[in-house]
């Protein structure tokens, strides 16, 4: 029996196994990356939906000075905090920070509405614009995070 045939067969087998392992590892990483992106996309979507629902509800709220400063209760009822906690589990720190700022800006908007400021008042307009601006910055950060996953 020739040793060269056995060695060539062994080397070919080892190379075949290594190539299969490398291909499986690459496939696993790609699948994991896709799952991570889907998880992050879902968390972002749920948070934005909850935040928008809360802001829309607040814009229709009746003036009630005793509710000023109590927006955290109302925002919790719309699922914003639950969605924000979910986002905190899967997102980068910069995204979580912008989500927190967006939540605070919606709380400020709530306070402007329940304080009785008219929709054309400077306080209302400033709060509405701040909420819109922080939401836009958040969406930009979400897009950046989704591209990097």
What are these regions (language model features)?
Residues 18, 22-149:
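Conserved non-transmembrane functional hotspots
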Residues 1-11:
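Feature marks short, highly hydrophobic, charge-poor N-terminal signal-anchor/signal peptide-like helices
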